[in-house]
């Protein structure tokens, strides 16, 4: 026990003792008088002594108390006794001492188990802070702010500028992603408003037809139909943002220079060649040399066969075919996907309830006013995926009856209803998805064209950006494969990659990307060959969880082999024509493979990206990078200064922010979407080739954070060290 506490207790207890001995018996007299007054009012007879007490005034009662001497009776032993036979003074004194002893005992216990003193001090400090004596406190805050080490640090100010960059890039990205078709679709839209063209593709669960709006429907809305593909509206439309709003980060350039040094001229320092350009330049020089040798050999052969016509006629045969394909794309710019319905009753609400995952990327989600409560609850629990340039452009969806479309009896006779095909097993209604039409799938593009190294890197960067967009919004695709990745081609521009077919996705607001796996009835996803090891090996149990946080990223690592010209290590080629050709290969099993068993990638893939793919395909998810870091690594490889990707080239935060500002300046000044021929968004400089690059840079800036960029740079430094 401390001396201070002991002193406080002695003073407190001594004060109680002094009060007890000096206290007059006033409360007892007042209580007696009140009782006597009550009896007199009720008419009860009072004793003479009581009547005398009532008739006397308080002053007379006080005098009588002083003058009255208590009468005593001498006992045989000589000690005075009163009528009751006990001494009132001694009994009352003992009673008072007992009372105070008990009170001291209780106070001592309460002082040990309560925090009276701490509460008093806390309340006193609060009163001083808010009602008085707060000047020293705020004086310290003023001194800290004046000295520069205040509440906001330099890192916070840098993040503030980075936030402005994200806002400007998001506005520009929204202008690119805007379309007028999804805004005009409503609940009254039906299959009769479309003109159905030839079939494009067919899968096990759906068929895709080329489509376009009918002429009469187009006349009702002037912007609903054009002769070309529906694309983004210009950024400087009447309802779009102005240049002042889009270029808000550039207005803070002076504040950035004042606080962190440097000059505006340093922005152009970051236009130096990146690591990707160096690698691609070396590759292109080697290819040019080989091409020159092949050209000389072909010239020699042409000199020998220059008078022969078969080669020229063969060339003329392929040209009209390509023109017919292009004309069909121009005349049918939309794609209509019809889902096969075998077991769902022909009711719009039932169909939407069973196939709601297909509608996750839809841009227009019209809610019927007569919808049931369960339908509203279902849509509230489902994640709505925001627009992104690397996610399929799905304008909307609707339910309607199944029609007798072209070649339906040949492509899907079993899925047709019996009113169309008597041997069919399909229902009369199904779900229709209206999308933008694309040129190829990733598998078709890789099989038909010989892509350059830079285009392959751009494809990988776009796929990682799409997967990162899904992960940021709590969606897992769970069925990534080369057939579900669509490609848009336009002239000589780099291909645009989008993810499609969300029928097996996980989009749950309740559980997010961590799905409880209590039984085998829970669906793990669609593609078992490209299923992440942590998903494939998880067994059901009361506490088992399927973590899809890095599952789609793992599938991207497997598809990276295909993008750079290698065989997918998790696909096998056995039987059939592969056996006859001697191309039988064994694949890795995603359940028990080791990282050192991964086959080497081709030389077309840069060494840094090879290490990234090997890291993505690590069987242990805790050792993989996150989707955000993986996308940042490829973006840094494409656009960052090459010395940042060398050993010891780690930049500081102001240098990173200057580089981000230079990228923002580039896309704001050069990459603003303008309306080109056919309503195609092109760069303001007219270079369609750079359109994909501007899309990638804008997607990167729309989510740029210094902490995440430094994390990607740290990973790069660990690899190149």
Curated annotation (Swiss-Prot):
<dbReference type="GO" id="GO:0007614">
    <property type="term" value="P:short-term memory"/>
</dbReference>
<dbReference type="GO" id="GO:0000422">
    <property type="term" value="P:autophagy of mitochondrion"/>
</dbReference>
<dbReference type="GO" id="GO:0048078">
    <property type="term" value="P:positive regulation of compound eye pigmentation"/>
</dbReference>
<dbReference type="InterPro" id="IPR000719">
    <property type="entry name" value="Prot_kinase_dom"/>
</dbReference>
<feature type="transit peptide" description="Mitochondrion">
    <location>
        <begin position="1"/>
        <end position="5"/>
    </location>
</feature>
<keyword id="KW-0067">ATP-binding</keyword>
<dbReference type="GO" id="GO:0047497">
    <property type="term" value="P:mitochondrion transport along microtubule"/>
</dbReference>
<dbReference type="GO" id="GO:0010637">
    <property type="term" value="P:negative regulation of mitochondrial fusion"/>
</dbReference>
<feature type="compositionally biased region" description="Polar residues">
    <location>
        <begin position="310"/>
        <end position="322"/>
    </location>
</feature>
<feature type="binding site">
    <location>
        <position position="358"/>
    </location>
    <ligand>
        <name>Mg(2+) 1</name>
    </ligand>
</feature>
<dbReference type="InterPro" id="IPR008271">
    <property type="entry name" value="Ser/Thr_kinase_AS"/>
</dbReference>
<feature type="region of interest" description="Disordered">
    <location>
        <begin position="279"/>
        <end position="322"/>
    </location>
</feature>
<dbReference type="GO" id="GO:0043008">
    <property type="term" value="F:ATP-dependent protein binding"/>
</dbReference>
<dbReference type="GO" id="GO:0005737">
    <property type="term" value="C:cytoplasm"/>
</dbReference>
<dbReference type="GO" id="GO:0006979">
    <property type="term" value="P:response to oxidative stress"/>
</dbReference>
<feature type="compositionally biased region" description="Basic and acidic residues">
    <location>
        <begin position="285"/>
        <end position="306"/>
    </location>
</feature>
<dbReference type="InterPro" id="IPR011009">
    <property type="entry name" value="Kinase-like_dom_sf"/>
</dbReference>
<protein>
    <recommendedName>
        <fullName>Serine/threonine-protein kinase Pink1, mitochondrial</fullName>
        <ecNumber>2.7.11.1</ecNumber>
    </recommendedName>
</protein>
<dbReference type="GO" id="GO:0000001">
    <property type="term" value="P:mitochondrion inheritance"/>
</dbReference>
<keyword id="KW-0812">Transmembrane</keyword>
<feature type="domain" description="Protein kinase">
    <location>
        <begin position="304"/>
        <end position="638"/>
    </location>
</feature>
<dbReference type="GO" id="GO:0000266">
    <property type="term" value="P:mitochondrial fission"/>
</dbReference>
<dbReference type="GO" id="GO:0030382">
    <property type="term" value="P:sperm mitochondrion organization"/>
</dbReference>
<dbReference type="GO" id="GO:1904061">
    <property type="term" value="P:positive regulation of locomotor rhythm"/>
</dbReference>
<keyword id="KW-0597">Phosphoprotein</keyword>
<keyword id="KW-0963">Cytoplasm</keyword>
<dbReference type="GO" id="GO:0035234">
    <property type="term" value="P:ectopic germ cell programmed cell death"/>
</dbReference>
<dbReference type="GO" id="GO:0045202">
    <property type="term" value="C:synapse"/>
</dbReference>
<dbReference type="GO" id="GO:0010821">
    <property type="term" value="P:regulation of mitochondrion organization"/>
</dbReference>
<dbReference type="GO" id="GO:0090141">
    <property type="term" value="P:positive regulation of mitochondrial fission"/>
</dbReference>
<feature type="binding site">
    <location>
        <position position="337"/>
    </location>
    <ligand>
        <name>ATP</name>
    </ligand>
</feature>
<keyword id="KW-0809">Transit peptide</keyword>
<dbReference type="GO" id="GO:1904457">
    <property type="term" value="P:positive regulation of neuronal action potential"/>
</dbReference>
<dbReference type="GO" id="GO:0005743">
    <property type="term" value="C:mitochondrial inner membrane"/>
</dbReference>
<dbReference type="GO" id="GO:0006511">
    <property type="term" value="P:ubiquitin-dependent protein catabolic process"/>
</dbReference>
<dbReference type="GO" id="GO:0072375">
    <property type="term" value="P:medium-term memory"/>
</dbReference>
<dbReference type="GO" id="GO:0072655">
    <property type="term" value="P:establishment of protein localization to mitochondrion"/>
</dbReference>
<dbReference type="GO" id="GO:0046872">
    <property type="term" value="F:metal ion binding"/>
</dbReference>
<dbReference type="GO" id="GO:0005524">
    <property type="term" value="F:ATP binding"/>
</dbReference>
<dbReference type="GO" id="GO:0051654">
    <property type="term" value="P:establishment of mitochondrion localization"/>
</dbReference>
<keyword id="KW-0479">Metal-binding</keyword>
<keyword id="KW-0999">Mitochondrion inner membrane</keyword>
